[in-house]
């Protein structure tokens, strides 16, 4: 298996040396969908974090208002 990987790596290095532009274009075309998926997932995660923070702030404010109302009732 190591021989197979070594041969494959040598082939890639040879290909990159003989046709660098073709190699780079192929690598970029192969990686572009992964970059797009990463961007979409990062955006979704940011939105989820923002929503969670809003909910936490809303709950905190609600708890503060409840505590404030209880204090005014006792007085």
Swiss-Prot record:
Signal peptide: none annotated. Residues 52-67 have a biased composition (Basic and acidic residues). Its main location: membrane. Pfam families: UPF0542. Residues 52-75 are annotated as: Disordered. GO terms for cellular component: membrane. Residues 49-75 form a coiled coil. InterPro entries: Smim15. Keywords: Coiled coil, Membrane, Transmembrane, Transmembrane helix. It is a single-pass membrane protein. It is found in: Membrane. The chain crosses the membrane at residues 21-41. Belongs to the SMIM15 family. This is Small integral membrane protein 15. It comes from Xenopus laevis (African clawed frog).
